[in-house]
């Protein structure tokens, strides 16, 4: 009984014990990223009401918006090797904040129907806005991940340094979750009370928070390392390739070969991205001791597969809005519950995550999250309703149970990078590994797109008084079942073959 009590006490107190005031400015940058969801509910409803984009088109857009996260190695190499105005950290965060602000201003222009925001169609301006914001967050994320290794006092014994590095990663994710708690319910309530334009104006506070954090942070910054041309030049060439492929997808091609190529531009970009990132990682890992190298590679593969699993897509939320009649305030309530329990879950499991093997963590994450999605499938087939249970009750309970596990999968890998990345190259290490993990999300987005093309789900779209797209949720049930089966079987089989099975 004493051991259980001690374990619970340690779980509750460890994050507090490991917090230091010198970590606070760094955590403000993570906090700003987590608080970006303050306009999330308003944006979801605005997109549904104002943009003529299908579920497949929105998923496809999400794939393209994940590409900046995939080319993080370019930003990482710049942060490691190219000071701007003598700064390797602050100026990059300032630039990122400026891009986020620019993207938000475009959203304000769209929502307020200002003439200066009509230089292109609403859909295209929205894409530009989203892209600017994403690039800004990517740049800030690269710098924050690098700083997470520089706020730790490395003059301590190595064992303590490694433990502190692990807890800085946990505290960073706690900061993101804490911000989510503070804005989750607020986002829904604001969407009920204020106009979309006003909410987007309020969200301009986000880049200000990150600017304050990076301005006051104290770091042990390594000297700039020499530019790694294969990574920087290759990354820039890859970025140009991605932009050209993205542009070409939306052009009319009379040449059949070009039309075929650009029809599958997302798939081509994914395959090229995978090859480029794996090659660059091989360059970074070549000097690592073989046993450690093998462990890092296996860990990366497992987390890649876990994050590459498909989701249901936007059709689920559309169904909840149109059929279950979930409104903005209720979505805000769900977000609030999820965010609160997410931070509690990460807090309680922090000691477990820091000390348990990654495959052990991911197995129970996979099983638990799969089981907890089953009530939502039940809602589609009216099982809770037939038992007299209200859909909102099911949604609240499901969110309450599932949310603590959403943020945990990346912490073990980030800790490994923080421990083994050499001084002067940490930004590149973080960026490349994060690029690989975000490429996994791109893979998940592609799988989601394919499933949505096979099992079509559509909301009702009216244009000029005419129904141009009818409402059809008949395929949503089978889509959710297939997604659930894939999400539980593929990661567990991968973990078994790489980490569990004896040689």
Write out the residue ranges for each language-model feature:
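Substrate-agnostic recognition of the 12-TM MFS/MFS-like secondary transporter fold
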Residues: 29-30, 63-75, 125-188, 309-310, ...
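Primarily marks hydrophobic transmembrane alpha-helices of the MFS/SLC 12-helix fold
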Residues: 92-93, 362
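Intracellular loop-helix junctions on the cytosolic face of multi-pass helical membrane proteins
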Residues: 1-21, 111-128, 139, 151-312, ...
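Transmembrane alpha-helix termini and helix-breaking/packing motifs in multi-pass membrane transporters
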Residues: 77-83, 108-116, 180-201, 250-261, ...
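Short extramembrane helix-to-coil loop segments that connect adjacent transmembrane helices in Major
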Residues: 49-57, 321-330
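C-terminal transmembrane helical hairpin of 12-TM major facilitator-type secondary transporters
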Residues: 360-412
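C-terminal ends and interior cores of transmembrane alpha-helices
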Residues: 94-120, 367-389
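Helix-to-loop junctions at the C-terminal end of transmembrane segments
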Residues: 69-87, 191, 344-364, 452
